[in-house]
């Protein structure tokens, strides 16, 4: 059977369920698909089917993630759900599943729990733009308790830098919705309405300022130097000015040719594997780890703060803890750069399996923005992953 072509008639948004273990994230994911399936907007997915999430590898780390797709009248959604708490942490830090927004699931019977806090903090650290709350299990919770839970949640969200007073909190029962109960289904439709209206439509990569990490460098006799790579964001046209950023001093050039699969193009855009011919650039001036970008849009830095996850021994990580001044390689986009790690005050050492905030100083500058992801490696083996949360130089 021929594959259906992907229709681009609605804006696409990536979303995920986050929250404490057993608060109903996977049940809610199944309930959304079963309720939307009734109007032909989704294929209903069983709880067990979502819970047996396949393993994926992202930046050398194995993560179990379930991917579900559905649509509303307004949008097309790709929804991720992770079976285990560690999978969530790894997912959010590696950016394996880039979230444009998230549904925070909280059981009305328990209220916010330790992982609720941790997921809100991580969502803040890795720049998840917006959250909507689903207060679950309200059919078996005390109504007076629910009011307190809602107040506590709004305070918690505000504490972590989200607009706690404005975030929609939808009350319902995912299990009842899954069983076809009318009240239960109504809450799911309310939730989807809140997600449609509250989670902002993401800016498409192609509309962001141009950036291409350099993967390889060639020289064409009589014509000049070509940098190749996959365009990460934006568009580039012939005769546009660019900057070459990272490793060494920033320099300007002009793109005099764009090639893709041996064909000449007028324009390259996000997602294209392209070769850019650069005026006045020597082959030795360009190397892996640099980026070619729209002038003034990205700067090179060596010092930053990051949220990191350190692999457990069973995940192929280190067998021993590390201490302040640990010097691994940080793999950004296409290259490794050595850096020194400083631990926060009061933290003596970091054990395999930990996640925490650290400060890093690289030996060479890398083009970076807040939110840039990286792997932490020792001799080519991945031992952790991270996301830049603040630039310090």
Swiss-Prot record:
Coiled-coil blocks: none
Protein name: Elongation factor Tu
Principal place of residence: cytoplasm
InterPro entries found in the cross-reference section: EF-Tu_GTP-bd, EF-Tu_GTPase, EFTu-like_2, EFTU_2, G_TR_CS, P-loop_NTPase, Small_GTP-bd, T_Tr_GTP-bd_dom
Binding site for GTP: 19-26, 81-85, 136-139
Region entry G3, spans: 81-84
GO molecular function: GTP binding; GTPase activity; translation elongation factor activity
Matching HAMAP family: EF_Tu_B (MF_00118_B)
Superkingdom of the organism of origin: Bacteria
Pfam families linked to this entry: GTP_EFTU, GTP_EFTU_D2, GTP_EFTU_D3
Catalysed reaction equations from the record: GTP + H2O = GDP + phosphate + H(+)
Annotated positions binding Mg(2+): 26
Region named G1: 19-26
Residue ranges of domain tr-type G in the record: 10-203
Keywords: Cytoplasm, Elongation factor, GTP-binding, Hydrolase, Magnesium, Metal-binding, Nucleotide-binding, Protein biosynthesis
Location in the cell: Cytoplasm
PANTHER family per the UniProt record, alphabetical: ELONGATION FACTOR TU, MITOCHONDRIAL, ELONGATION FACTOR TU-RELATED
Cellular component terms per the entry's GO annotation: cytosol
Region (G4): 136-139
UniProt similarity note: Belongs to the TRAFAC class translation factor GTPase superfamily. Classic translation factor GTPase family. EF-Tu/EF-1A subfamily.
Native species: Chlorobium phaeovibrioides (strain DSM 265 / 1930)
Function field: GTP hydrolase that promotes the GTP-dependent binding of aminoacyl-tRNA to the A-site of ribosomes during protein biosynthesis.
Region (G2): 60-64
EC numbers for this chain: 3.6.5.3
Subunit annotation: Monomer.
């Amino acid at each position: 059977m021929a594959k259906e072509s992907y229709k681009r008639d609605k804006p696409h948004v990536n979303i995920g369920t986050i929250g404490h273990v057993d608060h109903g994230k996977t049940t809610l994911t199944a309930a959304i698909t079963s309720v939307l399936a009734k109007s032909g907007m989704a294929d209903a997915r069983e709880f067990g089917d979502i819970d047996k999430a396949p393993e994926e590898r992202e930046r050398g780390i194995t993560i179990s993630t379930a991917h579900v797709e559905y649509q509303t009248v307004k949008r097309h959604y790709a929804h991720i759900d992770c079976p285990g708490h560690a999978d969530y942490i790894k997912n959010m830090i590696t950016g394996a599943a880039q979230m444009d927004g998230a549904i925070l699931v909280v059981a009305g019977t328990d209220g916010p729990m330790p992982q609720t806090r941790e997921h809100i903090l991580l969502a803040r650290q890795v720049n998840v733009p917006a959250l909507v709350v689903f207060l679950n299990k309200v059919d078996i919770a005390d109504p007076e308790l629910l009011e307190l839970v809602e107040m506590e949640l709004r305070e918690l969200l505000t504490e972590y830098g989200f607009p706690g007073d404005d975030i929609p909190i939808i009350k319902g029962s995912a299990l009842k919705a899954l069983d076809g109960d009318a009240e239960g289904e109504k809450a799911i439709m309310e939730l989807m309405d809140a997600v449609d209206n509250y989670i902002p439509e993401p800016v498409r990569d192609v509309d962001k300022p141009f950036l291409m990490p350099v993967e390889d460098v060639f020289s064409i006799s009589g014509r000049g130097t070509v940098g190749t790579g996959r365009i990460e964001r934006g568009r580039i046209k012939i005769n546009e000015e660019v900057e070459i950023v990272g490793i060494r001093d920033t320099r300007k050039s002009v793109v005099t040719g764009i090639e893709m699969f041996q064909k000449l193009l007028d324009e390259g855009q996000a997602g294209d594997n392209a070769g850019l011919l650069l005026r006045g650039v020597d082959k030795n001036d360009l190397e892996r780890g640099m980026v070619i970008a729209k002038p003034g849009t990205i700067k090179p830095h060596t010092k930053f703060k990051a949220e990191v996850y350190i692999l457990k021994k069973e995940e192929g990580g280190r067998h021993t803890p590390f201490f302040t001044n640990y010097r691994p390689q940080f793999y950004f986009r296409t290259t490794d750069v050595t850096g020194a790690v400083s631990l926060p005050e009061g933290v003596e050492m970091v054990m395999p399996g930990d996640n925490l905030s650290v400060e890093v100083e690289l030996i060479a500058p890398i083009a970076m923005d807040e939110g840039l992801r990286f792997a932490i490696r020792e001799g080519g083996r991945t031992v952790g992953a991270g996301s830049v949360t603040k630039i310090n130089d």
